[in-house]
Swiss-Prot record:
This is Protein MGF 505-5R. Belongs to the asfivirus MGF 505 family. Induction: Expressed in the early phase of the viral replicative cycle. The keyword Endoplasmic reticulum does not apply. Keywords: Early protein.
Length: 498
């Protein structure tokens, strides 16, 4: 029945003083032996205009008394039904318990609210499909050690293992300690795995206490191996406090352990132990190379370099190999600021296979002049980069042509010079030059023994009906002076037709 009275009971927050006790009882707002009930906000009730208590505490009291009418009123006021069940369990009001329990889905939701172990067990028994293991697991999760102590003999070895792991994962340290000291556990080492997983150093400490003080069967070799493994894990996870806790029981921070800290860029761990250990130069160098491969931060690289006094002569080639293989330039920049230049050796490798966009960023980062980039691109047969970098310097084709010509004069690499001349000639083909400019370009080709390009431009001049006899004579003189025999032969052949 959802009557007007029910609506009033649910929403009334104020009882006038002049209402008699009889009227209050008829409204259903009276609690026998306690007095009138009045809702205060959403979470409290006022009893007999005098005592204010939380609505859930009132529900527990009503459940304990078995007062179904008051329970229903308080539930109407949005109290938590779990507290009514707890109260009913305290006084064994099973008719009320059954009525209320039918309205909830799972007794396990109530367990965290219970402090009394006996009530805890009673509540768990409401679910007829649960077993002792289920009870103990929930007891562990809710710090009910006494229940575990009572039922430990009813658990199999496999059950004990499950309970122990649950205690570890729930980080119930007192229960973990008690189990380790009083119950035979098949795989007690799981405590360490969970300690690292939960990053709980207290659990790690308990594990070591159990390992060393309660005679777990491990040989010294196994223990040493275990401690080393834990140091490596902690270093890789950046857990310095785990490392310090482990070192209380043995182990050593070796180069392998520090390598884990380097791999995951845990500079604070490195700093702590490098200050306290005198590592060999070779070990520091290996750590630095590993840091480069792992793309560690500038701070980590600087830290390792500082312990090497920025001396990299022994590993110069290895650094360059790492930079090339892992495409990282952080170390190059750090050393460059310390006046140690590794840009020249790496530039050729980078320009050989990186994109223009990447190389532009590289050029800006290290303040490299475009002229150097173009010459290196020529050495590495990257005509695409020659074109793009020259466009960056000179937007106009004619200006670009003159700029590239100027680079040829200072280019020593033979194949690189030939590629520059080839690029210049392609640029010439794409832009319109005056005859005077074409004559200058022909002389340029002659000076640099560019036979094919010289022959091509002379052919273009002839097609324009321009007399090139004097040009050929001038260029012949250049060729004879420089002993360019093939060019001499080409010019002499052309002169027969002029």
């Amino acid at each position: 029945m959802f009557s007007l009275q029910e609506i009033c009971r649910k929403n009334i927050y104020f009882l006038p003083d002049w209402l008699s006790e009889h009227v209050i009882q008829r409204l259903g707002l009276y609690w026998e032996k306690h007095g009138s009930l009045q809702r205060i906000g959403d979470d409290y009730v006022l009893i007999q205009q005098d005592l204010i208590i939380p609505i859930n505490e009132a529900l527990r009291m009503a459940g304990e008394e078995g007062n179904d009418e008051v329970v229903q009123l308080l539930l109407l006021w949005e109290g938590n039904i779990h507290y009514a069940i707890i109260g009913a369990l305290e006084s064994d009001h099973y008719s009320l318990i059954r009525k209320l329990y039918d309205q909830i889905e799972d007794c396990h939701d109530i367990l965290p609210l219970i402090q009394d172990p006996k009530i805890f067990e009673k509540c768990h028994e409401l679910d007829k499909f649960c077993n002792i293991l289920c009870l103990v697991l929930h007891a562990v999760k809710n710090d009910m050690l006494c229940i575990l102590q009572e039922y430990k003999m009813h658990l199999s070895g496999e059950d004990i293992q499950v309970v122990f792991e649950t205690a570890c994962r729930s980080q119930k340290n007192d229960i973990v300690s008690w189990m380790g000291q009083n119950i035979a556990i098949y795989n007690s080492g799981v405590i360490f795995d969970i300690a690292f997983d939960k990053m709980n150093v207290s659990l790690l400490s308990i594990g070591y206490t159990l390992l060393f003080n309660h005679h777990i069967n491990n040989t010294n070799e196994n223990i040493n191996s275990l401690l080393t493994q834990h140091l490596e894990w902690a270093a890789g996870m950046g857990l310095l406090h785990f490392m310090l806790e482990t070192l209380k029981y043995g182990g050593d921070v070796t180069i392998i352990v520090l390598s884990e800290a380097v791999k995951y860029d845990h500079r604070k761990i490195l700093d702590y132990f490098l200050r306290r250990k005198n590592l060999y130069q070779e070990d520091l160098e290996e750590l630095l190379l590993l840091a480069i491969r792992a793309d560690c931060s500038k701070k980590t690289l600087n830290l390792l370099l500082s312990y090497l006094n920025y001396s990299i002569n022994n590993i110069r080639k290895k650094i360059l190999q790492c930079v090339k293989e892992y495409e990282t330039t952080v170390i190059i920049k750090i050393l460059w600021k310390r006046k140690i230049n590794l840009i020249e050796p790496i530039l050729a490798d980078f320009i050989g296979y990186h994109s223009y966009t990447y190389m532009v960023d590289f050029m800006r980062e290290f303040s490299i002049h475009p002229e150097k980039m173009i010459k290196m691109a020529a050495r590495e047969s990257r005509e695409d980069l020659i074109i793009k970098f020259s466009k960056k310097v000179c937007k106009e084709p004619k200006d670009r042509l003159h700029y590239l010509k100027s680079l040829v004069y200072t280019m020593r690499h033979k194949e690189g010079k030939q590629l520059l001349i080839y690029t210049i000639h392609n640029l010439y083909k794409a832009c319109h030059l005056e005859s005077k400019e074409m004559f200058n370009l022909a002389r340029f080709y002659a000076r640099h023994n560019a036979v094919i390009q010289f022959k091509s431009i002379c052919h273009d001049l002839s097609k324009l009906n321009i007399n090139i006899k004097n040009l050929l004579l001038e260029c012949l003189g250049i060729a004879i002076k420089k002993n360019y025999f093939q060019l001499i032969k080409t010019i002499e052949t052309d002169m027969r037709y002029e």
